[in-house]
Amino acid sequence: LHGTGLRPVQRVLKDMGFENVYIEPSQAVPDGNFPTCPYPNPENPDAWKLALELAKEKDADIVLATDPDADRLGVYCKDTKTGEYVTFTGNMSAMLIGEYILSQKSANGTLPENPAFVESIVSTDMGKAIAAAYGVKHIEVLTGFKYIGEQMLKFEKTGCNNYVFGMEESYGCLPGTYARDKDAPAAVCMLCEVAAFYKSQGKTLWDGMIDMYEKYGYYREGISTMTLKGIDGAAQI
């Protein structure tokens, strides 16, 4: 969304072998004025209008958007039963990635000793169920990815656990230890791999989410957003 994500995302998708990638041209150019969406946040439905129009034209399986500094990832997926594109919350997309990582590492015998799944206290409790299913320690931290990074540093210093995945509900996750903040290009890599995994089974990401609800239970979530602008808004905050 008029930011820094396009170049790394295009590069990693190309390196992974994804060829049918379409870019919404009017939002591809970095521009701090954000001419097509004054509030360039993947959580904001208005930011998706142009991308969804392109997705319908191309009959795309999934639609991805990163925020201007490329730390958060939003996603829509086509529901083949209705033909409509449905949105995923940050909790939903992170659970798809986290469950995939744990299931694949478990199946391949690459899950490290004392593995840990870290998430913020405002994130979905589905993470607890997923971690428990694979014998992974689940750790909750305060809101803010720096606290997840703090756990990573603790693990490295003490050896008490090995970080496997971390996430927060505000559309951010980190599937590795190379950074201490959420990373949208890495999330793109993982979510596209998950989508390809389900597609190989004749399923969509949405089908995969339904499978997870059936396996781990349905976790209802909701969020209220309040915008307070300018000096008056700052005073109210």
What kind of region is each of these model predictions?
Residues 46-50, 97, 147:
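Well-ordered alpha-helical segments embedded in enzymatic catalytic cores
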Residues 25-29, 90-94, 142-146:
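Short, acidic/turn-prone active-site loops that include or flank metal/cofactor-
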